[in-house]
Amino acid sequence: AVLLCWLPHLAVSYPASMNSDTQSQFDQILGLLPWSKHHPTLLAFFLLGTTRLGHALGSGNAGLFAYVLAQAVFAAAVIGYSQRIMRRLCAPVWLRALSLALCAFAPVYCDNITVILKDVPYSYAMLLMLCEMVRQRFLEKESEGFSAGFVLRMTLSAFLMLRMRPNGAMVWIPICAALFLGTRGR
């Protein structure tokens, strides 16, 4: 549902939006500027890969749009997962509907989803991590331990958080410590 609401924004912003920081990274990827360690290497590889894909299909713009579309699909999946967690926690319908409407229509979500920026996948990776923390703490039995799905989702969130922003470790490590200490006390 959220992805459908974002389609007009994706169409208007085709192929993508970039701020000046991302533009300089893109220029580095294209060889127009010298390479810098200022930008996340993972984002550079994603941009390079999707741009090459676009060129192979006949349009570099299609490659940039492929990146933005993949980002939007990931974000919509995480938002959908957060709705599922809220439902399992018996959150009131009005709260779930309000949070879904906020994600679908608030300018910050609609605009950010069309921007190539390291903060977008980082933010949704953090939301995924928070959903897993809540699910593990409040919805799972201690005797079940960590499921394969939990490990997969936490690994994905850790990978994106640690590779997209230098401060990802300052968030990830204390939260994991709290998770493991919290499960021991249950």
Where are the language model's segments positioned?
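Extracytoplasmic catalytic/substrate-binding loops of multi-pass membrane glycan-assembly enzymes
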Residues: V12-Q25, P34-T50, G58-A62
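Membrane-interface alpha helices of multi-pass inner-membrane proteins
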Residues: F150-R165, C176-A177
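Transmembrane-helix motifs of polytopic, lipid-linked glycan transferases
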Residues: L69-C90, L128
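Perimembrane helix-loop-helix junctions
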Residues: V171-R186
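Membrane-interface transmembrane helices that cradle and orient dolichyl/undecaprenyl
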Residues: M129-F150
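Start-transfer (signal-anchor) and selected internal transmembrane alpha helices
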Residues: A1-P8
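Multi-pass, polyprenyl lipid-linked donor-dependent membrane glycosyltransferases
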Residues: N19-Q23, A66-V73, A101-M133, L160-V171
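Transmembrane-helix signature of polytopic, membrane-embedded enzymes
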Residues: S82-F105, S123-Y124, S143-A148
